[in-house]
Amino acid sequence: MEDEQSRMKKKKQERRAPVTHTDSKMSIISLGKPEPVLTTGTDYQEIWYDNDFDHYSQPIDRLALAQLVNLNGQHGGVLYARRNMVAADYVRGGLSHEELKAGVFDYLTFGDVAIAKVRNGWGDVVALAPLPSLYLRVRKDDSIVILQKGEPLVYSQEDVVYLKQYDPQQQVYGLPDYIGGIHAALLNSEATIFRRRYYHNGAHTGGIIYTNDPNLSTEVEDEIIKSLEQSKGIGNFSTLFVNIPKGDPEGIKFIPIGDISAKDEFANIKNISAQDILTAHRYPAGLAGIIPSNSAGLGDPEKARATYRKDEVIPLQRMIMDAINSDPQIPAHLHVKFDIEDTQSGAL
């Protein structure tokens, strides 16, 4: 009788025996490398003379400054608004409206701009043209170099009018006046991109796929690993069908690593960083499309515009006129003229 019960028990255990794994070691897989959101490239560097390329290095990477314009809505929007306000009063001169807007935008974005004097065969100045500041470099003899494929374009000091914003640490290149707000612009953009990727990825920031079902065969495990490794990029956690006969419903789990819904500072980051950007540009919030958070509002936008025009726009317009019109080689018909005597604006 005992032998019969022993055989019955052994047979029952054999029926319940789980699938054994040939490889019992722990498995860890990666679902893709971390993707960088933004690279700063905007740290201030000491300039030095590059003898190989025969020009001074730049204090801040200009490609990073150019990319930042399109990465952040507040920063880029304010730059375009500042450019438009300067160009709105342009009357006439050796620059077309489009050329003036390009030169002003480069001056605001990179901190300097070079206006080339276009000469005829007799050496007379017959036109003016802004040079792209993104590719502008300066040599020891103060000549201006414009990088391009092949040999660079070189303009002697007397062939350009070089306007630059003051930098107390060096006097070779100009420095944008919004430098103090760069990190706020980066933070604002990174917060938005992080939120977009969070929802693209299934409302989680990644996690651990944990399996503890003894009925999960090695073949099924390999198929799961293969499917996960083949899914890359944003939203790499897609629907996956797994069939484990007599499996445990809790045998496969996805454990999120982080959850931003518990303490979401997205709104605070966006609001504070946006205010920092406007402060760096000294630009009125009422002109930037900022929605007021209090019942008092942002004041009269016409008064804000008049004050901003008086303190920021007109001084820049006068500087451009003085730099170009005071050059003895530039004839009077090429002198630039801004209508800065607009009494209706209330700026003067």
Model feature map: region roles:
Residues 1-135, 260, 297, 305, ...:
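Flexible, gly/proline-biased loop segments at the beginnings
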Residues 2-12, 151-298, 303, 307-348:
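Extended, charged amphipathic alpha-helical segments
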Residues 23-52, 138-146, 189-210, 241-243, ...:
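Short, charged N-terminal helix-start/capping segments
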Residues 36-40, 46-48, 121-174:
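Active-site and NAD+-binding cores of ADP-ribose-processing enzymes
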